Regions:
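Helix-loop junctions and terminal segments of transmembrane helices
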Residues: 34-35, 64-80, 150, 266, ...
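Hydrophobic alpha-helical transmembrane segments
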Residues: 125, 129, 159-207, 377-381, ...
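Membrane-interface junctions at transmembrane-helix termini in multi-pass inner-membrane proteins
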Residues: 136-160, 347-374
């Protein structure tokens, strides 16, 4: 099939088009899997699955000490400088050893307490110990993905992402039919192993060009540069999952496990279509912003990104809204209380998308204080509003808090980004 010329000449459109195909396939498969999960484990089971996924998200950052965005930035900048790359990966090696040992020991020896915190029972302590054993694979997958994104190798990333997803879904379904909820949780814990194996199969030859494994040293010459990204990652990749875990626990305590499952379901739908933007940011936006130094060029690039992806997202979100009852019936039959949540979640996610485009400037230019301030403000506002609004509005109050959070967030991020350029020009 011939690619239209207007797409061929625009890298962002090419990435968007390929990404759309991969995400569409994932969404279709995910819909089937989600329905099966709902039928087998119910809303309460989905709440527990959400808790483990949040823990996995948290470990992706802790295990590599939050160096992912730093790897993307520095690989994009130094892809032709072997000496700098070796310094980068030696530092990353040190960070990973520290992160893996610290998080692995914590999970293994406090598995009972963590199981109680996440699932309100110590029955899943075996699962926490299994996750502790898998942590090295979580770290390796995160680092190698950073290299792919830094090289903007979007075709290879799409292939790796899709094959990994298909295999992890297959494992999930096999274990679901064999062991029900426990099987699904074990499959989620084991997924990083599959991801690393697929990544090495498709990408090892390229990795060897940029990482000379035998020359890696237990030294950290770029620690100062990467620690800035560690600080930024701490807020988004560690505090965010903790907030999500706490809100689910709060919903279960104040309302019911089913209500916690309802919120988990709406956020699951949201995360599935927001996956579309995540890879675009790290494959295109972050490397692009890293090479832009003037306000004029930045505004021009932001407008190009907005004109390319916002109309696509708006169309997709409108379709999700208008077909929300069908989506609920297909994925979560009988869970009609989800319907009022869609409008708040979708509008909030659209504003979030526009904000995240601008936020990548903080990562590209290592604007640590601006990044941490905006993220902390966003998380604290969301957490406080969720606690307040859940009393009069129930689960809907949490999703309303999500929308209010991102309205404030957009204006704060926009103000800080353009203040940066104004100071630079002065």
């Amino acid at each position: 099939m011939k690619i239209p010329s207007f797409i061929r000449g625009n890298l962002l459109l090419k990435m968007t088009s390929l990404n759309a195909v991969v995400v569409s396939i994932r969404l279709l498969i995910s819909a089937v899997v989600q329905r099966l999960l709902y039928d087998y484990v119910g809303a309460v089971g989905l709440y527990k699955i959400g808790q483990l996924r949040s823990l996995s998200q948290l470990l992706m950052s802790i295990s590599s000490l939050g160096s992912f965005s730093g790897i993307v930035k520095y690989v994009a900048e130094y892809k032709t400088d072997k000496e700098q790359l070796q310094k980068l990966f030696s530092t990353t090696f040190v960070f990973t050893v520290v992160g893996v040992l610290a998080s692995g020991i914590l999970l293994f020896f406090f598995s009972g307490q963590l199981s109680q915190y996440l699932f309100a029972t110590e029955n899943f302590s075996y699962l926490i110990k299994l996750t502790a054993v898998v942590i090295p694979f979580i770290a390796i997958q995160r680092i190698f993905n950073g290299v792919i994104h830094g090289l903007s190798d979007y075709k290879k990333f799409a292939k790796i992402d899709l094959v990994s997803y298909l295999l992890s879904v297959t494992l999930t379904l096999i274990l679901l039919f064999q062991y029900n909820l426990d099987g699904v949780l074990i499959a989620i814990a084991l997924t990083p192993i599959i991801q690393v194996l697929i990544l090495l199969y498709f990408f090892f030859k390229t990795l060897r060009e940029y990482i000379i494994f035998k020359d890696l040293k237990f030294k950290s010459p770029m620690a100062k540069g990467l620690l800035a990204f560690t600080a930024m990652s701490f807020v988004t990749s560690i505090l965010l999952p903790l907030v999500e875990i706490d809100i689910r626990s709060m919903l279960e305590e104040k309302m019911s496990g089913k209500d916690a499952g309802v919120w988990t379901n709406i956020t699951f739908i949201s995360k599935n279509y927001m996956v579309f933007s995540g890879s675009l940011f790290t494959l295109y936006v972050l490397p692009k912003f890293a090479g832009i130094y003037s306000a004029h060029n930045f505004k021009k690039e932001v407008l190009t990104i907005y004109k390319t992806i916002l109309p696509l997202f708006a169309t997709g979100m409108l379709l999700v809204y208008f077909f929300r009852h069908l989506i609920i019936e297909l994925l979560y039959p009988g869970l009609t209380e989800m319907a009022p949540l869609f409008k708040w979640q979708l509008i909030g996610d659209f504003i979030r998308l526009a904000s995240l485009v601008l936020l990548n400037q903080f990562l590209a230019k290592k604007l640590v204080r601006s990044f941490i301030f905006s993220e902390l403000f966003s998380l604290v506002l969301f957490y406080v509003l969720a606690q307040i609004l859940v009393v009069p509005y129930g689960v809907e109050g949490v999703v309303i808090a999500h929308l209010i959070r991102y309205i404030f967030y957009f204006f704060i991020v926009a103000f800080l980004v353009f203040r940066y350029f104004k100071k630079k020009e002065d």
